Amino acid sequence: MRSRARTAVSVVAAAGATLLVALAAFFGLQRQGPAEHASTGAGAQELGAPDYGVCRGVSARCYHDWGNFSPATDGYRVLLYTRTAGPRHAHLGPALGAGLNPALADTNVVQNAVVRMGAEHGFTVDWTEDVTQLSTPARLFRYNAVIFHSTSRDALDDAAQTSLRQYIRGGGGFAGIHNAFGTEYNWPWYEGLLGGANFYDHGPEQRGEVVVRSRHDASTSGLPARWAFTDEWYNLVPAPSKVRVLATVDESTLAEGVTGGQGHPGHGRNHPVAWCQYYDGGRAWLTTLGHDAGAFTTDGSFPGAEQFQDMVLGGIESAMGRSPFCRAD
């Protein structure tokens, strides 16, 4: 009888202890939350690195060099994709016609800028907003890199999703610029291609300072240590993980603050704006910058435009394997 009583008391005591631990953890977390963001610039608490079920990171062991590209024979060629299935940035200009390389207006600022880059630096640029141009892996394997620049929402159909995945797995290159982060929200594999990152919100468009964090990629190797630029400064959830951060924004230089329209407090001292990674067999170079059409001007009227364009050019060239990509520090 006494044995059963002692057992019952032990069970009650253990249950009570478990409850106390749980309550302590709960209230501890409740107290920790505000403290995490109490000081300006603390940044959002990161919630871990998502798992996309692929080889990803900064090691070239995640790259598939399967001989799908012959630049010595075929030269270098990229495909610029700017389809929008939602909000359209002004720098894209009017929607393009069907097919490959449709007519461009002067107000198709991004498309004209990338075509000019190619012409000046020895690689061919095709452009399209026609999803059927991405309908098979064979179409994409003509290109050393595919560029998504300010695409939006569900810009790919099922066939194009499959083709892009097979292209990357076969050693293809990808460059995602600005609202590439506002694209294919419901496709986890694509989020991984972006570095395990996605657009959440942004604060006011304003001037800030970009800080180069690594020169081990062609995109940042020749840039000044700091340079002024005006942008929206995307806040990200999730934030990039298992990537090499190439550049950040110094949040202390943002006079109007970094808090976004949905309350994101920013990323503190490590607010990434450009990074690179190997992903599922391919190369991916990413930047959240490039909102303002002025960033693509060449007349010196937009501070930081020259540095931004140099970074994008280097990112494209590294993604397509022409220049050093995402090397170890």
Provide a role label for each language-model segment.
Residues A22-Q45:
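C-terminal region of N-terminal signal peptides and the immediate post-cleavage residues
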